């Protein structure tokens, strides 16, 4: 039916293309894996991802659109702190940070780890420059109805003077975490403004 080995030539050509395609795919996969390994081994803590920018702006009460996050987020200053016995020390990265402080347009937001209903999460708290009021707060990594109550509250002596139900462990944890952030941000604020 086919003269002069047409089928044999067609099959040989097909096999050559198949080998080239497989080799090309393997090398591109290796390149992607190398890039992912390089990126994961050296995190860039000077840049904040858009999701975190959203949490920070929400806590600060900054109204913005999703498409503006990246450009506005470039103006956020980020500071990482370790803490021992109430004394805060700056550290170079997010790793081992007990408190992360964001500073934007003369407003502060603090981020700290929190455990809510057995889930590890992070709480963000926005604080006015005079440390007299909490602007807003929000969670990343857990959900809680309590979060809506921790906004627009007065601060006195570096803490919220409110009472929570002693039997509600999440409410106690919220209050402790918010007060920890307020106290920490107020203590380290002179370092940020210099």
Swiss-Prot record:
What membrane topology does the annotation report for this chain? Lipid-anchor
Q: Which GO terms describe its cellular component?
A: cell outer membrane; membrane
Does rRNA-binding count among this protein's keywords?
Answer: no
Q: What is this protein called?
A: Outer surface 22 kDa lipoprotein
The entry's localization annotation reads: Cell outer membrane
Which keywords belong to this entry? Cell outer membrane, Lipoprotein, Membrane, Palmitate, Signal
Residues bearing a lipid moiety (S-diacylglycerol cysteine): 22
Lipid attachment, kind N-palmitoyl cysteine: 22
Chief subcellular location equals membrane
